[in-house]
């Protein structure tokens, strides 16, 4: 920044986050547990700069394929992975950048010589992907916990960083008023019926958003409210049992 003797740049692209995240998502979910550190390592330096989390044009050109093309699985699971990726980006601390075409799931990489493949919006799954992006952006704007404290641990706390065997992570996002969101990411196509996680406060934890919703093209498994219990989990005195849809962020 100029006030610190610099040239006036206030943000830096987090290329480490981008490289590690895309490398992780390109893995077959069966083997993601062996690459779990790609998810957690980025938080070791997340607050060393004012970062932007980029899913930019540079990753969808020159034979690299589109974001959708990088996702493993069949047609259904490619969309599930892409929704999870976009939600994971939004839930992590740092400002967001996403290149055009990502919002509706373009299959071909970007070609500067022609327009985007808008005809894909004639297909239901691409319409639902676009709707997901719209509602995800609105959810982000309406919940200050996701953007108000992006530069310190005051706005982010781990709940479960190392459940590598299940390929699950969970964390808290916190705003300046102390309001919180509890975020659970399931990086496998397996429904987790009774996942115990630590919780910071007593009460009922009610699902407010999930990428698995049927209206977004997901399986529509749903997540029931979870009641806290006086059962310690890791550093938390309380915990709760959560129902976590497959390949989703909730």
Predicted regions and their residues:
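Carbohydrate-interacting/catalytic domains
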Residues: 32-34, 63-64, 73-98, 102-250
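Short, well-ordered beta-to-alpha junction loops that form the rim of enzyme active sites
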Residues: 1, 55-58, 101-104
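Substrate-binding cleft/loops of secretory-pathway carbohydrate-active enzymes
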Residues: 1-31, 40-46, 107-110
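Aromatic-lined glycan-binding groove of carbohydrate-active enzymes
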Residues: 28-68, 92
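Short, charge-rich amphipathic segments
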Residues: 5-26, 55-75, 121-135
